[in-house]
Amino acid sequence: MKKETQTKGEVTRLAVEDAAISLFLEQGYHATSMRQIAKRAHLALGGIYNHFSSKDEIFEAIIIDQHPYKKILPLVLAVEGETAEAFFRDAFRIVIRELGQRPEFINLMFIELVEFKGKHGSIMLREIAPKVLPIFRKHVKKMKGLRVHNPALLMRSFFGMIISYFVTEMIISNSVLSPLMPKNSADAYIELFLKGILKEPA
Protein backbone atom coordinates (compact mmCIF):
# COMPACT_ATOMS: atom_id res chain seq x y z
CA MET A 1 0.00 0.00 0.00
CA LYS A 2 1.47 3.34 -1.04
CA LYS A 3 1.70 6.17 1.42
CA GLU A 4 -0.34 8.56 -0.75
CA THR A 5 -3.31 6.18 -0.74
CA GLN A 6 -3.37 5.75 3.04
CA THR A 7 -5.67 7.57 5.40
CA LYS A 8 -4.29 9.20 8.53
CA GLY A 9 -5.70 6.33 10.57
CA GLU A 10 -3.97 3.73 8.37
CA VAL A 11 -0.66 5.57 8.64
CA THR A 12 -1.01 5.64 12.43
CA ARG A 13 -1.89 1.93 12.58
CA LEU A 14 1.17 1.01 10.52
CA ALA A 15 3.36 3.24 12.70
CA VAL A 16 2.09 1.37 15.76
CA GLU A 17 2.71 -1.98 14.06
CA ASP A 18 6.26 -0.96 13.06
CA ALA A 19 6.99 0.24 16.60
CA ALA A 20 5.65 -3.02 18.02
CA ILE A 21 7.70 -5.15 15.61
CA SER A 22 10.94 -3.45 16.62
CA LEU A 23 10.15 -3.79 20.34
CA PHE A 24 9.02 -7.42 20.08
CA LEU A 25 12.28 -8.28 18.32
CA GLU A 26 14.41 -6.31 20.79
CA GLN A 27 12.92 -7.55 24.06
CA GLY A 28 10.23 -10.14 23.36
CA TYR A 29 6.46 -9.99 23.28
CA HIS A 30 5.69 -10.35 26.99
CA ALA A 31 8.37 -7.84 28.03
CA THR A 32 6.86 -5.16 25.79
CA SER A 33 4.10 -2.92 27.15
CA MET A 34 1.47 -0.88 25.34
CA ARG A 35 3.07 2.22 26.88
CA GLN A 36 6.43 1.36 25.27
CA ILE A 37 4.78 0.78 21.90
CA ALA A 38 2.97 4.12 22.12
CA LYS A 39 6.20 5.91 23.02
CA ARG A 40 8.12 4.28 20.14
CA ALA A 41 5.29 5.25 17.75
CA HIS A 42 5.30 8.84 19.10
CA LEU A 43 1.73 8.55 20.35
CA ALA A 44 0.03 9.24 23.65
CA LEU A 45 -0.95 6.02 25.42
CA GLY A 46 -4.62 6.87 24.99
CA GLY A 47 -4.07 7.42 21.27
CA ILE A 48 -2.93 3.85 20.69
CA TYR A 49 -6.22 2.51 22.07
CA ASN A 50 -8.09 4.38 19.35
CA HIS A 51 -6.61 1.83 16.94
CA PHE A 52 -5.91 -1.32 18.98
CA SER A 53 -7.65 -2.67 22.05
CA SER A 54 -4.73 -4.83 23.18
CA LYS A 55 -1.17 -5.92 22.48
CA ASP A 56 -2.47 -9.22 21.12
CA GLU A 57 -4.58 -7.32 18.60
CA ILE A 58 -1.44 -5.46 17.46
CA PHE A 59 0.42 -8.73 16.95
CA GLU A 60 -2.50 -10.17 14.99
CA ALA A 61 -2.60 -7.02 12.83
CA ILE A 62 1.11 -7.37 12.09
CA ILE A 63 0.54 -10.93 10.85
CA ILE A 64 -2.39 -9.85 8.66
CA ASP A 65 -1.22 -6.41 7.44
CA GLN A 66 2.53 -6.75 7.02
CA HIS A 67 3.42 -10.39 6.49
CA PRO A 68 5.41 -10.94 3.25
CA TYR A 69 2.88 -13.54 2.08
CA LYS A 70 0.84 -10.66 0.62
CA LYS A 71 3.66 -10.07 -1.85
CA ILE A 72 4.66 -13.72 -2.18
CA LEU A 73 1.20 -15.14 -2.96
CA PRO A 74 0.69 -13.37 -6.32
CA LEU A 75 4.19 -14.41 -7.40
CA VAL A 76 3.54 -18.06 -6.52
CA LEU A 77 0.09 -17.97 -8.14
CA ALA A 78 1.75 -16.73 -11.34
CA VAL A 79 4.16 -19.70 -11.53
CA GLU A 80 3.30 -21.90 -14.51
CA GLY A 81 5.45 -24.98 -14.18
CA GLU A 82 4.89 -27.56 -16.91
CA THR A 83 5.62 -30.28 -14.38
CA ALA A 84 5.09 -30.57 -10.63
CA GLU A 85 8.87 -30.52 -10.18
CA ALA A 86 9.25 -27.26 -12.13
CA PHE A 87 6.40 -25.64 -10.21
CA PHE A 88 7.73 -26.57 -6.76
CA ARG A 89 11.28 -25.53 -7.64
CA ASP A 90 10.17 -22.10 -8.87
CA ALA A 91 7.70 -21.58 -6.02
CA PHE A 92 10.31 -22.52 -3.40
CA ARG A 93 12.90 -20.14 -4.87
CA ILE A 94 10.37 -17.28 -4.86
CA VAL A 95 9.38 -17.85 -1.23
CA ILE A 96 12.99 -18.18 -0.05
CA ARG A 97 14.02 -15.02 -1.91
CA GLU A 98 11.13 -12.90 -0.64
CA LEU A 99 11.20 -14.12 2.96
CA GLY A 100 14.97 -13.73 2.96
CA GLN A 101 14.44 -10.00 2.38
CA ARG A 102 12.26 -9.78 5.53
CA PRO A 103 14.25 -11.70 8.18
CA GLU A 104 12.34 -9.99 10.98
CA PHE A 105 9.31 -12.10 10.09
CA ILE A 106 11.27 -15.29 10.65
CA ASN A 107 12.00 -14.04 14.18
CA LEU A 108 8.35 -13.07 14.66
CA MET A 109 7.45 -16.61 13.64
CA PHE A 110 9.40 -17.89 16.65
CA ILE A 111 7.48 -15.50 18.91
CA GLU A 112 4.25 -16.79 17.37
CA LEU A 113 5.20 -20.43 17.95
CA VAL A 114 6.68 -20.07 21.45
CA GLU A 115 4.44 -17.44 23.01
CA PHE A 116 1.16 -18.00 21.14
CA LYS A 117 1.40 -21.71 20.29
CA GLY A 118 0.69 -20.84 16.65
CA LYS A 119 -2.83 -19.46 17.22
CA HIS A 120 -2.39 -16.61 14.72
CA GLY A 121 -1.27 -19.11 12.09
CA SER A 122 -4.87 -20.28 11.74
CA ILE A 123 -5.92 -16.68 11.05
CA MET A 124 -3.33 -16.37 8.31
CA LEU A 125 -4.33 -19.74 6.84
CA ARG A 126 -7.93 -18.55 6.54
CA GLU A 127 -6.67 -16.04 4.00
CA ILE A 128 -3.94 -18.13 2.38
CA ALA A 129 -5.51 -21.59 2.11
CA PRO A 130 -8.45 -20.68 -0.19
CA LYS A 131 -5.94 -19.20 -2.66
CA VAL A 132 -3.15 -21.75 -2.38
CA LEU A 133 -5.01 -25.04 -1.89
CA PRO A 134 -6.51 -24.96 -5.42
CA ILE A 135 -2.95 -24.85 -6.82
CA PHE A 136 -2.04 -28.02 -4.97
CA ARG A 137 -5.33 -29.63 -6.05
CA LYS A 138 -4.50 -28.78 -9.66
CA HIS A 139 -1.07 -30.38 -9.43
CA VAL A 140 -2.41 -33.49 -7.72
CA LYS A 141 -4.97 -33.97 -10.53
CA LYS A 142 -2.93 -32.82 -13.50
CA MET A 143 0.67 -33.80 -12.98
CA LYS A 144 2.21 -37.22 -13.10
CA GLY A 145 4.93 -38.41 -10.80
CA LEU A 146 3.45 -37.25 -7.49
CA ARG A 147 3.41 -39.79 -4.67
CA VAL A 148 1.22 -37.56 -2.48
CA HIS A 149 -2.42 -37.29 -3.54
CA ASN A 150 -3.83 -35.29 -0.63
CA PRO A 151 -3.63 -31.57 -1.59
CA ALA A 152 -3.79 -30.37 2.03
CA LEU A 153 -0.95 -32.71 3.04
CA LEU A 154 1.08 -31.57 0.05
CA MET A 155 0.55 -27.92 1.02
CA ARG A 156 1.45 -28.64 4.65
CA SER A 157 4.66 -30.45 3.69
CA PHE A 158 5.65 -27.60 1.34
CA PHE A 159 5.10 -25.00 4.09
CA GLY A 160 6.96 -27.26 6.53
CA MET A 161 9.93 -27.46 4.20
CA ILE A 162 10.12 -23.66 3.99
CA ILE A 163 9.97 -23.25 7.77
CA SER A 164 12.55 -25.98 8.39
CA TYR A 165 14.85 -24.46 5.76
CA PHE A 166 14.93 -21.09 7.54
CA VAL A 167 15.20 -22.61 11.03
CA THR A 168 18.12 -24.87 10.12
CA GLU A 169 19.75 -22.10 8.07
CA MET A 170 19.80 -19.88 11.17
CA ILE A 171 21.22 -22.67 13.35
CA ILE A 172 23.86 -23.85 10.87
CA SER A 173 25.01 -20.40 9.76
CA ASN A 174 28.55 -19.70 11.04
CA SER A 175 28.71 -23.15 12.66
CA VAL A 176 31.15 -25.98 12.03
CA LEU A 177 28.60 -27.44 9.60
CA SER A 178 28.37 -24.32 7.46
CA PRO A 179 31.45 -25.02 5.27
CA LEU A 180 30.26 -28.60 4.75
CA MET A 181 26.96 -27.53 3.19
CA PRO A 182 26.44 -27.50 -0.61
CA LYS A 183 27.20 -24.20 -2.32
CA ASN A 184 23.51 -23.64 -3.04
CA SER A 185 21.77 -25.17 -0.05
CA ALA A 186 18.32 -23.98 -1.18
CA ASP A 187 18.56 -26.03 -4.39
CA ALA A 188 19.77 -29.04 -2.40
CA TYR A 189 16.86 -28.62 0.01
CA ILE A 190 14.19 -28.58 -2.68
CA GLU A 191 15.90 -31.58 -4.29
CA LEU A 192 15.45 -33.52 -1.04
CA PHE A 193 11.81 -32.43 -0.85
CA LEU A 194 11.11 -33.57 -4.41
CA LYS A 195 13.11 -36.79 -4.54
CA GLY A 196 13.74 -37.81 -0.94
CA ILE A 197 16.91 -39.38 0.42
CA LEU A 198 16.42 -42.92 -0.88
CA LYS A 199 17.38 -44.13 -4.33
CA GLU A 200 14.81 -45.93 -6.42
CA PRO A 201 15.55 -49.68 -6.45
CA ALA A 202 17.38 -50.76 -9.59
Where are the regions that the model predicts?
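Short secondary-structure transition hinges
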Residues: 97-135, 178-180
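Short, charged helix-capping/linker segments at alpha-helix termini
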Residues: 30-31, 145-149
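C-terminal peripheral helix-coil segments that are non-catalytic and often amphipathic
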Residues: 2, 97, 101, 133-142, ...
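Helix-turn-helix
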Residues: 15, 19, 23-57, 61-62
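Amphipathic alpha-helical linker/stalk segments
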Residues: 62-91, 136
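Amphipathic alpha-helical packing segments from all-alpha helical-bundle domains
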Residues: 70-71, 118-145, 152-153, 167, ...
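Residues in soluble alpha-helical coiled-coils and helical-bundle/repeat scaffolds
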Residues: 39, 50-57, 61, 82, ...
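Helical hydrophobic small-molecule/effector-binding pocket
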Residues: 64, 86-111, 159-166
